[in-house]
């Protein structure tokens, strides 16, 4: 048996690297310095956030110097929350080049231009809320009158699309649907559209891909429209968008993939980058776990195994609520 003292006080090798250290608030220090100078040294997920700031700064530098295509993917709950305004900021200032989202990411952006969502509570009785016509997304409330008014707008919008389809003898893709929606917002909504992602994507000609465009309220409205309208032949083509999205990755000199959440937007982006032998940079923000084999929880190294992220890519995954860390990430990079 070994000497217990030798076991406890086992000699260690000399270890070089970044020393763990937090910010000293006795010094004159601001949030920018905390994020850029200290977060990487704190450890745990703070280190990942600090690394993400550095990676995105590299991306931004390369975007200014050479052809760099930045893909941003986000699930609808990001738009349900106040992250919508952050994404709109990035689009407005052309910090991203391609957007991929779910149907909720489109429709909730539009609905917020009609009336705002309201801060609620996680624990209220669902049956009582249903009786009052109040929908709950986490601790965010969306009264149903928003959707009622949304249908009025969408019926008019579908009429425009249907006439366009018939006159041009062309079926619009989902990304063209989103572009036309941005144009419709420009022509029909007030100042609230200035906070909109879809509106600024239209103004800056930044494509929005939404492969599951019917999986949400837009799909509900399409159902009623096609059932009730005499001219119910309105169609949306999702096949052309896969060509357009993949070609944007293939034709790029370098690419970066920034993903909030998981599911369809995440896979659409990284799978497009498979066609160019993987993305050069990747930043994931997620709370999904990898242990169930889901795409949402798949870490960057899993993407490397598929060829969706390059072996030598600069990447990081932050395992955290995006509503907490994404504002700090954007601030650390752009402010």
Curated annotation (Swiss-Prot):
Pfam families for this protein: DS
Domain of life of the organism encoding this protein: Archaea
Molecular functions per Gene Ontology: deoxyhypusine synthase activity
Keywords of the record: Hypusine biosynthesis, NAD, Transferase
Active site as annotated: 308
Entry similarity comment: Belongs to the deoxyhypusine synthase family.
Function: Catalyzes the NAD-dependent oxidative cleavage of spermidine and the subsequent transfer of the butylamine moiety of spermidine to the epsilon-amino group of a specific lysine residue of the eIF-5A precursor protein to form the intermediate deoxyhypusine residue.
HAMAP family registered for this protein in UniProt: DHS
Name this protein carries in UniProt: Probable deoxyhypusine synthase
Organism ancestry: Archaea, Methanobacteriati, Methanobacteriota, Methanomada group, Methanococci
